[in-house]
Amino acid sequence: MTTHSPVVTVDGPSGAGKGTLCMLLAEKLGYNLLDSGAIYRVLALAAIHHGVDLNSEDALVPLAANLDVQFKAEGELVKVILEGEDVSAELRKEETGMAASKVAALPQVREALLRRQRAFSAQPGLIADGRDMGTVVFPNAEVKIFLDASAEERANRRMKQLQQKGLDVKFDRLLSEIQERDDRDRNRAVAPLRPAEDALVLDSTSMNIEEVVVQAITFIESKL
């Protein structure tokens, strides 16, 4: 094992199972957890709590740089703790998402949050969940995993999740939304979604989560 704090990055498209994998890896290894997908929502919520103007880079940058947030894997959920308070439910509100879109459009805020995310790297280690963790945020990470699955399989998983909540959804619509998002993510000008050159690419299309975890742990142990 290395004496410093190892970083394990897990990137991949929406619905591939990154969140579940990262939560289980953090629990098994006892590592810290970073959910980069939630970080802009967390900042937006902090701004709302403190009455900060969502359009003011000058006000948002110091808030982003000193963001007091923790991600804790508990059971099958990731708790998000902002300034000592569990804000997991608040993060899912539509108004939080809209506010997050505003702050994410500000270049200096993005740069400040990039530095803040890198500060999550601490003993005993870090599991970083995102889309550009291995390519942009932690390009020198010891372990990089790219978790993928076919668009059809991801749409099927999403449909089952929504049906369990009692929602009537159409497979074709979900598939179309996922394909459109994939296209945006893979072709955007800044930090397009792609595996790092030294990443292990895991295709979970025909794997269950236990099989994915076993392969990920084996790869991590071979690298550290």
Swiss-Prot record:
UniProt cross-references to Gene3D superfamilies, sorted A to Z:
P-loop containing nucleotide triphosphate hydrolases
Q: What Pfam families does the annotation carry?
A: Cytidylate_kin
Q: Does the keyword Cytoplasm apply?
A: yes
Supply the alphabetized keyword list.
ATP-binding, Cytoplasm, Kinase, Nucleotide-binding, Transferase
One Gene Ontology CC term in the entry = cytosol
Name a single GO biological process.
Answer: nucleobase-containing small molecule interconversion
E.C. number? 2.7.4.25
Q: Where in the cell is it found?
A: Cytoplasm
GO molecular function annotation? ATP binding; CMP kinase activity; dCMP kinase activity
Catalytic activity reads: CMP + ATP = CDP + ADP; dCMP + ATP = dCDP + ADP
Top enzyme class, one word, equals transferase
* Superkingdom as given in the UniProt entry: Bacteria
Annotated binding of ATP, by residue: G12, P13, S14, G15, A16, G17, K18, G19, T20
Q: Which NCBIfam families match?
A: cmk
Family stated for the protein in its record: Belongs to the cytidylate kinase family. Type 1 subfamily.
Instruction: State what protein this is by name.
Output: Cytidylate kinase
Organism equals Aliivibrio fischeri (strain MJ11)
